[in-house]
Amino acid sequence: MTKHPVFFISFFLIMAMIGAAGADDLQPIQLLPPQIDGGKPLMQVLQKRSTSREFSTDQLPPQVLSNLLWAAYGFNRPDIGKRTVPSASNCQEIDLYVSMAGGLYLYDARTNRLEPILNEDIRALAGKQPFVKTAPVNLIMVADFSRMGKYSPEEKDIYSHTDAGFIGQNVYLFCASEGLATVFRASIDKPALAKAMKLREDQKILFSQTVGYGKK
């Protein structure tokens, strides 16, 4: 794997500093270009896919984080606006938030950046299990129903949950390939988390997925 020591140091300096900064001072994080030429063979990855609820507090290196987010919800055909996962009528209604110690970010796949949302560590709100508040990354999948105008409320709910499931499986497969631990969860205090995230009424939290290294 190509190493980028300068970026690595800069990334974690940013993560360490933003805890003392105001929300307006929180800066976007430009992710490294995803590496799409590595990984284990598919059949081996399927054999290794598993759920884990034991995580170390070790941070994910910048390249691994970038690769993870691209695998989860990046554009694999950017010229036609298509992603690594399908969505109902290509609504692309899911927003993927990234909760880390330094704050809450929104993954912008088009610019390959993390856009700052909250200068707070809200990892503890991303689930009800103890490991959630100390694991390095919690992905939060939020449906934006304003992008699904033609569907009924019931259809929006069904399709968005299905689309989030595709993202979750991509994360599972990536983690199996990279030797990471992960668990896909619906056990969330959704009203409390939605309030902290300042979501609109037509946005709905669906699932959260914890990612990190297994506990040593």
Predicted regions and their residues:
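Bacterial N-terminal signal peptides that target proteins for export
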Residues: M1-I9
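Bacterial N-terminal signal peptides
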Residues: I9-M17
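N-terminal amphipathic, basic helical "cap/leader" segment at the start of enzyme domains
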Residues: A21-A135
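Short, small-residue-rich loop/turn micro-motifs
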Residues: Q35, M141-F145, Y213
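Small-aliphatic-rich amphipathic alpha-helix that forms the alpha element of a beta-alpha
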Residues: R49, L68, L96, V137-M148, ...
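Short coil/turn connectors at secondary-structure junctions
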Residues: K133-P136, D202-K204
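A glycine-rich helix N-cap at a beta->alpha junction
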Residues: L199-K216
